Amino acid sequence: MGRKKIQITRIMDERNRQVTFTKRKFGLMKKAYELSVLCDCEIALIIFNSSNKLFQYASTDMDKVLLKYTEYNEPHESGTNSDIVEALNKKEHRGCDSPDPDTSYVLTPHTEEKYKKINEEFDNMMRNHKIAPGLPPQNFSMSVTVPVTSPNALSYTNPGSSLVSPSLAASSTLADSSMLSPPQATLHRNVSPGAPQRPPSTGSAGGMLSTSDLTVPNGAGSSPVGNGFVNSRASPNLVGTTGANSLGKVMPTESPPPPGGGNLGMNSRKPDLRVVIPPSSKGMMPPLSEEEELELNTQRISSSQAPQPLATPVVSVTTPSLPQQGLVYSAMPTAYNTDYSLTSADLSALQGFNSPGMLSLGQVSAWQQHHLGQAALSSLVAGGQLSQGSNLSINTNQNINIKSEPISPPRDRMTPSGFQQQQPPPPSQAPQPQPPQPQPQPQPQARQEMGRSPVDSLSSSSSSYDGSDREDPRGDFHSPVVLGRPPNTEDRESPSVKRMRMDAWVT
């Protein structure tokens, strides 16, 4: 692509003609200089413009060149404009023809600038388009339940995800690498019969954990999801979140309860894990006898391997991707863990009841605090060694600001059932662990508090619903989990504690 050619005719515009003359005169002198140097010759240029102004150029000395010219008498080449035009026509340069048909193929500097700008904008658009699918949606929230109580339940998680992989950082201590299985092989392993299945969600699906032995009921419809995670925007009843409410209130499900008293059967490989979903907000789970509880505790202890370095408990982790709702996500500082560490006696007081929908633990080793990146989703308690068979529920659901549709009857303006929040004593003053006591049916007066799980009395999360029921929290710290326990056996046998255990019985 060369310079745009113009028609060689007289320029009518005076100003344009003057500019062209100046530029081309300098170009001509430049060419004369190059020729004189390259070919070792003498050149003299004599130019008169349209106004008879003289411009001359000589490679050495004009008088010397002119003297040599006047004294030269031999035949020589002499050319005029007509000779140049004829020479150009013979060489088919067509210098006199108008090159208008070629203008569409010639790029001027201005046109090249436009093309470069268009190319840069297109490259930026393509680059942003490629990056956009990898970003998690800002208004999209996922709820993930991670059961890792036996070697067969350890699922594979994408290391590139900052949501779940930090909570399973301790899983690298497991010796058997064959416990890891890709989530694609376990997406559709356990689905309730006779119900349609929802396809896997597309938002950040690569980083979500797929639980191979968990059936998640969907409270918004009648389709259980077997892929291990549920879109919490479409299902108000999630495993481990009790109706997507971090206070543990029971939301009624529109779908009929599954057979067997609301128990969803797990896979035959883990008979000790069952997800218990209350049929409605006014129903309560049937009590378990002492023999059944002891049998389940024995199964939990026996199912955990002795040489296994870590048996990760079941934790419901929810993506805190709704910053516009004003929820406070606060990390649990290390000082909290040292001042209020869990002991065997504390867990014995908490043994036997969990939040409805949470999965009970098997053998639990030492916990460590996991800080989940910018979301500050760290409510895993880093305490001492936990006793075998101890039950502990940690609800970190912060996905939805529930402010409407309370289904349960009106509640008292106090902590549920009078179960006061107490700080656990130091480990040096902790009593010995006590076995769980069989509990009879709760008293009828506790029916008005049935909609609230005991996790509410444990100050489960930082939801804005019923915020006036508690004391005013500190502005700089919101404790996701405050574990309270009855101070002695008499308090644990009180009707309020009995109602709380019955309200959240998990097997």
Swiss-Prot record:
PTM sites of type Phosphoserine: S59, S98, S235, S255, S355, S408, S453
Mod. after translation: Constitutive phosphorylation on Ser-408 promotes Lys-403 sumoylation thus preventing acetylation at this site. Dephosphorylation on Ser-408 by PPP3CA upon neuron depolarization promotes a switch from sumoylation to acetylation on residue Lys-403 leading to inhibition of dendrite claw differentiation. Phosphorylation on Thr-312 and Thr-319 are the main sites involved in p38 MAPK signaling and activate transcription. Phosphorylated on these sites by MAPK14/p38alpha and MAPK11/p38beta, but not by MAPK13/p38delta nor by MAPK12/p38gamma.
Keywords recorded for this protein, A-Z: Acetylation, Activator, Apoptosis, Developmental protein, Differentiation, DNA-binding, Isopeptide bond, Neurogenesis, Nucleus, Phosphoprotein, Transcription, Transcription regulation, Ubl conjugation
Segments of skewed composition (Polar residues): 209-245, 390-402
Modified residues (N6-acetyllysine): K249, K403
Known DNA-binding region: 58-86
Amino acid composition bias (Low complexity), ranges on this chain: 453-466
Pro residues bias spans: 423-443
Keyword match ATP-binding: no
UniProt biased composition (Basic and acidic residues): 467-477, 488-507
InterPro entries in UniProt: HJURP_C, MEF2-like_N, TF_MADSbox, TF_MADSbox_sf
Cross-link Glycyl lysine isopeptide (Lys-Gly) (interchain with G-Cter in SUMO) placement: K403
Residue ranges annotated for the MADS-box domain, each copy included: 3-57
Chain positions covered by the region annotation Beta domain: 289-296
Residues with site note (Cleavage): D176, S177, D213, L214, D466, G467
GO cellular component: nucleus
Subunit structure: Binds DNA as a homo- or heterodimer. Dimerizes with MEF2D. Interacts with HDAC7. Interacts with PIAS1; the interaction enhances sumoylation. Interacts with HDAC4, HDAC9 and SLC2A4RG. Interacts (via the N-terminal) with MAPK7; the interaction results in the phosphorylation and transcriptional activity of MEF2A.
Free-text function comment from the UniProt entry: Transcriptional activator which binds specifically to the MEF2 element, 5'-YTA[AT](4)TAR-3', found in numerous muscle-specific genes. Also involved in the activation of numerous growth factor- and stress-induced genes. Mediates cellular functions not only in skeletal and cardiac muscle development, but also in neuronal differentiation and survival. Plays diverse roles in the control of cell growth, survival and apoptosis via p38 MAPK signaling in muscle-specific and/or growth factor-related transcription.
Family: Belongs to the MEF2 family.
Protein name from the UniProt record: Myocyte-specific enhancer factor 2A
Organism: Sus scrofa
Gene name per UniProt: MEF2A
